[in-house]
From Swiss-Prot:
PANTHER family: CELLULOSE SYNTHASE OPERON PROTEIN C, TPR-REPEAT-CONTAINING PROTEIN. It comes from Cyanidioschyzon merolae (strain NIES-3377 / 10D). This is Photosystem I assembly protein Ycf3. Essential for the assembly of the photosystem I (PSI) complex. May act as a chaperone-like factor to guide the assembly of the PSI subunits. Disulfide bonds: none annotated. InterPro entries: PSI_Ycf3_assembly, TPR-like_helical_dom_sf, TPR_rpt, Ycf3/AcsC/BcsC/TPR_MFPF. The keyword Cell division does not apply. Belongs to the Ycf3 family. The gene is ycf3.
């Protein structure tokens, strides 16, 4: 195992232990604790490429999570899984749901733009490319220092 992998494993284990301690110490409801536990399980499964298990954990987390912003991240992660599996329409659906809850979720804006851009290039569809541009503009407006490739693409598009 390389040093980098050892460090990553150490960090993952440290995060897990720290998260367990925080969940036990912080004054949160039982539902919030269950939601967080399922969310962590989902993240771990997703990181290992166990997408079916990750989805199951995320759906359980949604049953218990009451915080709108936290729900948006769970839904966003579900979208990531669908995108990873090439299910762009499903991914778009979840990214849009995440944005309804959290309009400042720039990662969702970017990922929507990426899908529209890919579809626009594949089908030579100017409307899809315009949609991609609109979502990238929103993402760049919220996070000006990020998405440099998108900024360059937008400059060349004009």
């Amino acid at each position: 195992m390389s040093r980098s992998q050892k460090n990553d494993n150490f960090i993952d284990k440290t995060f897990t232990i720290l998260a367990d301690v925080l969940v036990k110490l912080l004054p949160t409801s039982q539902n919030a604790k269950k939601a967080f536990s399922y969310y962590r399980e989902g993240m771990a499964a997703q990181a290992e490429g166990e997408y079916a298990q990750a989805l199951e954990s995320y759906y359980h987390a949604l049953e218990f999570e009451e915080d709108v912003i936290d729900r948006s991240y769970i839904i966003y992660n579900i979208g990531l899984i669908y995108a990873s599996n090439g299910e762009d329409e499903q991914a778009l659906e979840y990214y849009h749901q995440a944005l309804e809850l959290n309009p400042r979720l720039v990662q969702a804006l970017n990922n929507i733009a990426v899908i529209y851009h890919k579809q626009g290039m594949t089908y030579q569809d100017e409307q899809l490319l315009q949609k991609a541009a609109a979502y990238w503009r929103k993402a760049i407006q919220l996070a000006p220092g990020q998405y440099l490739e998108a900024q360059n693409w937008l400059k060349n598009m004009v």
